[in-house]
Amino acid sequence: MRKLIVLSVALLLAGFTQLEATTDSTLRMSNVIYEGDVRAVRLYQQNSGFSFPILTLGGGESLVLEFDQIKSERDFYQYTLVHCDAQWNPTSLSRTQFLDGMGYENIETANFSNGTLTQYTHYSVSVPGEQTKPKIGGNFILLVYRNFDEKDIVLSRRLMVLNSQGAVNMQIKQSGQVELRSTHQQINFSFTKNANYFMPNAMQDVKTVVLRNGEWDYSIDDLKPMFIVGNEMQYNQTLGNQMDGLNQYRFFDIRSFRSSTAGVRQRLNIANQKHVILVNDKTRRFERYFNWADFNGRVLYDNKDLPMPAGTAFESDYCFVHFSVSADA
């Protein structure tokens, strides 16, 4: 017997909004939203919306932080950076020791939604600003707060500042364990330090983290090298560096509310709110594997109904997306 399981979730018409809000206002050194009306948070490199949030120390690059708040009034936000150790605990350094400038920036750019059923305010800012330039490399938490009160936290995001002291080479391959070959991937990598970089104890001084699809929720931490040959540390463990490969992500396109798009069965306006009904899906358990070229769960923010893409961030509407899957009872 098979039954249809129906689920609904609120999404941005131009893409996906991360459901990671918490009612606890205590700062967590991770990617967290602390207010329920904040949506669609993104932190990415200036010229690539899918990039990992990493900067090169003194390199002149910028990250872009964007987010929405589901209300038509503007709040006044600031951000700062918190320096962390390898385990993402705040260090004892004072802000003047790791940042140039006053140590905070105002988030000046705010656009009210235009032509949308859901009223929201879109905020954006370049990171770092003139008053928040990192002086050292390492792990940082970007902390957004309201009205100059760092206890009134809105969101936090992890980012890294790279002070390159070597090079990393990596290879992803099928698991070397026979029983895991159909489910896991093995990540072999090596780190070659610069010849003039002094490292007293490589086994203790080098901290590693391997992320699956750039997500901190699933990582392999603090692997130790199998071999150290000259300036090169080799991490080719048999078991420690393996990750389960997951399934292919399911795809749907909600970039338009006017024309047909992939995976969408119906579009509705109900009680002044947009709804999208996706095509009924089914389990792929017994189907032949098909390699779909996706973005590993990442989302493209776009709106095909706009004549110009410049307004995508504040002229795209939110909608409820209803999806269903047939599964064994």
Where are the regions that the model predicts?
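Bacterial Sec-dependent N-terminal signal peptides
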Residues: 1-25
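Extended low-complexity, serine/threonine- and proline-enriched intrinsically disordered segments
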Residues: 72-101, 199-223, 329
